[in-house]
């Protein structure tokens, strides 16, 4: 039986045990991660935490709605047993009516019929299986990716794991942040706390690229759990655009992890240029479903359209 459980009544030890042992577990769904990223969250729980579904929510005036927090690409149902369309449908049907509106992402394991009325779109992430030897993985690189790596080596760019998360965040703020990326000051604080919490838990790896004159060029935050490494965040300077530092960073990480039972998840992007950059490393597209549920029949469609535009714009800019 699936029941609705308010945050204060969630057994967090059982919750995280479920995520630990889920066939589709992801670090996004751990209680500590949700506590740091979501304004508030409740949950749907099946039986004794056999399967769970987080419900991050906000309240605006009279309306309580489910939303997708920043720094979380996928949520949905996480289960200790094999998932199918019926399970996903049952969880969606169990979302209480007090949530008058919902717009959130499932994960790549959550299946639904193509004609399901709640499907509001499809998101894409890019994944690369690192189980193969480095030489084999390198063969999947595009010509442009190879050129960028060669350029970085010629310019004597070097990679290290020594550095501070603040350097990566600052590079993003000073470059992408100045181009209208809709990050509030709170978002940057949350990101910093997420990284340090992940480091404390042994889930975060940082990689930095420096120029031949020892100037910071680029950095990446990798989150690892459940045999998957997610490229959660990156930042780069204008110099990195000219010296191929970001390509070298990713190539270095692929070489480091090649032959291991790991999948590198680039976290996808709605930006065509960035998606092309990720595909340049031989990654493949993986689709996850976006769910939109409107239980407010008199909610004006223009308002919904405006909300969707803002959400998509934020997603594109965040992943850029």
Task: For the regions a language model picked out, list residue spans one by one.
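A generic structural signal for well-ordered alpha-helical segments
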Residues: 19, 95-96, 152, 257
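Aromatic (often tryptophan-rich) hydrophobic motifs at membrane interfaces
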Residues: 49, 86-93, 193-196, 200-302
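Active-site/acyl-donor-binding loops of N-acyltransferases
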Residues: 57-61, 117-136, 259-320
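A gly/proline- and charged-residue-enriched helix-loop-helix capping module
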Residues: 68-109
């Amino acid at each position: 039986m699936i029941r609705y459980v308010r945050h204060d009544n969630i057994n967090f030890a059982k919750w995280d045990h479920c995520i630990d042992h889920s066939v589709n577990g992801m670090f996004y769904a751990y209680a500590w991660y949700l506590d740091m990223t979501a304004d508030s969250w409740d949950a749907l729980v099946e039986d004794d935490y056999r399967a769970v579904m987080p419900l991050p929510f906000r309240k605006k005036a009279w309306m309580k709605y489910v939303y997708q927090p920043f720094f979380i690409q996928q949520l949905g149902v996480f289960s200790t047993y094999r998932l199918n369309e019926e399970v996903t449908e049952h969880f969606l049907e169990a979302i209480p009516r007090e949530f008058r509106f919902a717009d959130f992402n499932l994960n790549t394991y959550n299946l639904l019929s193509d004609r399901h009325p709640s499907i509001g779109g499809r998101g894409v992430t890019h994944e690369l299986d690192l189980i193969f030897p480095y030489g084999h993985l390198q063969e999947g690189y595009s010509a442009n990716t190879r050129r960028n790596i060669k350029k970085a080596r010629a310019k004597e760019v070097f990679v290290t794991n020594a550095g501070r998360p603040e350097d990566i965040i600052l590079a993003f703020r000073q470059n992408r942040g100045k181009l209208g990326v809709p990050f509030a000051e709170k978002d940057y604080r949350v990101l910093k706390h997420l990284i340090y919490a992940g480091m404390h838990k042994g889930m975060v790896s940082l990689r930095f690229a420096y120029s031949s004159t020892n100037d910071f060029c680029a950095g990446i935050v990798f989150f690892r759990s459940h045999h998957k490494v997610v490229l959660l965040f990156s930042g780069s300077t204008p110099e990195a655009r000219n010296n191929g530092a970001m390509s070298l960073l990713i190539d270095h990480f692929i070489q480091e992890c090649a032959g291991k039972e790991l999948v590198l998840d680039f976290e996808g992007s709605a930006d065509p240029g960035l998606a092309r950059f990720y595909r340049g490393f031989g990654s493949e597209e993986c689709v996850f479903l976006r769910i939109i549920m409107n239980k407010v029949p008199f909610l004006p469609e223009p308002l919904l359209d405006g909300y969707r535009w803002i959400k998509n714009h934020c997603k594109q800019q965040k992943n850029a």
